[in-house]
Amino acid sequence: MAKYEILYIIRPNIEEEAKNALVARFDSILTDNGATVVESKDWEKRRLAYEIQDFREGLYHIVNVEANDDVALKEFDRLSKINADILRHMIVKLDA
């Protein structure tokens, strides 16, 4: 299984309940498509290097994932591009 790290930035003015629901939804997208979520944790609220959609700060969330193929990652990528609460995301394959 290949190991991946996903980092995504959530808009800072989201309510706590909505943020938890968003994180749970995107974790389930990964698991429903065959990936295993090893760890999913909030990093911190950080100042952005440049303004994104009129926001100067963002809530960073990190997910470590193991997957046999990239089906779950492609679905995560597709849906995170559509979601207005996620400002940016990045998927990185970790060395084995």
Swiss-Prot record:
Keywords from UniProt, A to Z, are:
Ribonucleoprotein, Ribosomal protein, RNA-binding, rRNA-binding
Pfam families according to UniProt: Ribosomal_S6
| Gene Ontology molecular function terms on file | small ribosomal subunit rRNA binding; structural constituent of ribosome
Gene source species: Streptococcus gordonii (strain Challis / ATCC 35105 / BCRC 15272 / CH1 / DL1 / V288)
| Gene Ontology CC annotations of this record | cytoplasm; ribonucleoprotein complex; ribosome
Question: Which Gene3D superfamilies would you find in this protein's record?
Answer: 3.30.70.60
InterPro entries cross-referenced by the UniProt entry: Ribosomal_bS6 (IPR000529), Ribosomal_bS6_sf (IPR035980), Ribosomal_S6_plastid/chlpt (IPR020814), Transl_elong_EF1B/ribsomal_bS6 (IPR014717)
Q: Which family does it belong to?
A: Belongs to the bacterial ribosomal protein bS6 family.
Q: Which domain of life is it from?
A: Bacteria
Q: Name one GO biological process term.
A: translation
Q: Report the record's disulfide bonds.
A: none
Query: What protein name does the entry list?
Result: Small ribosomal subunit protein bS6
Q: Tell me which positions the record assigns to the signal sequence.
A: none
- Extract the PANTHER family matched here: MITOCHONDRIAL 28S RIBOSOMAL PROTEIN S6 (PTHR21011), SMALL RIBOSOMAL SUBUNIT PROTEIN BS6M (PTHR21011:SF1)
Its annotated function is as follows: Binds together with bS18 to 16S ribosomal RNA.
